[in-house]
Amino acid sequence: TIMKLEGKVAIVTGGARDLGRAISVKLAAEGAKVCLNYFDNEADAQETLALIKNVGGEAIAVQGDMTKAAAVKNLFAECNKAFGDKVDVLVNVVGGIVGRKKITEQDEDWYDFLMDVNMRSVFLCTREVVPMMPAGGSIVNFSSLAARDGGGNGASMYATAKGAVMTFTRSMAKELGPQGIRCNAICPGTIATSFHDRFNTPENRERMKASYALRREGTADEVA
């Protein structure tokens, strides 16, 4: 079989579990050398590396907080060290809703945290990758359905940050297009991941499922 991504190098932020894991494994299965970043869960990262090995892929895992410029620099340096000085694919999965708060319950730290984890991480990684991304390269950012519809109860800052990601992606598509770099955003709705196991209620998930054409939640593999 022809591997679509033979000889390509891919970085996946938040690449150790759920959506990130499915994407990391899929990229590796298609022949890319994968450098996956994880925040703090070493066990998840090791498990993902094992899954990649199972599909005959090649990967490394690098710990780091993608809201910090130094950690982002380190991620790309480690990737270069392992796989050479170019990156063909960047998938920014890092982000999350973290919790639900009404506007009067949100303090400045909450605002900063949600904007940092969802938007600053994308900004820092994109800025870092551009000088080392050849023509034909691709940047994929994870926005959210919340960016389009304002999000559910208490998700205003998450929705706002993801809206910023969507607009930033459009700006980058214009700016980087002439260099032959594609930039796209994916806006998933409810995907069955541990994210929803933690931050959603079974009743709400059932109600949302009923509103979808397929009457069910999506899966991480479908997104990948």
Residue ranges and their predicted role:
Residues E30-E47:
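Conserved glycine-rich Rossmann-like NAD(P)H-binding loop of the short-chain dehydrogenase/reductase
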Residues V9, A16-R17:
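Conserved glycine-rich cofactor-binding loop
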Residues Y212-V223:
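A conserved structural motif in NAD(P)-dependent oxidoreductases
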Residues P131, K174-P178:
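Alpha-helical segment proximal to the catalytic Tyr-Lys
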Residues K73, G96-D112, P131, N153-M157, ...:
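Conserved mid-core segment of classical short-chain dehydrogenase/reductases
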Residues D88, T104-F123, V140, V165, ...:
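Catalytic Tyr-X3-Lys loop
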Residues T126, A161, T169:
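Active-site helix of classical SDR
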Residues S144:
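Residue(s) in the substrate-gating loop at a strand-loop-helix junction
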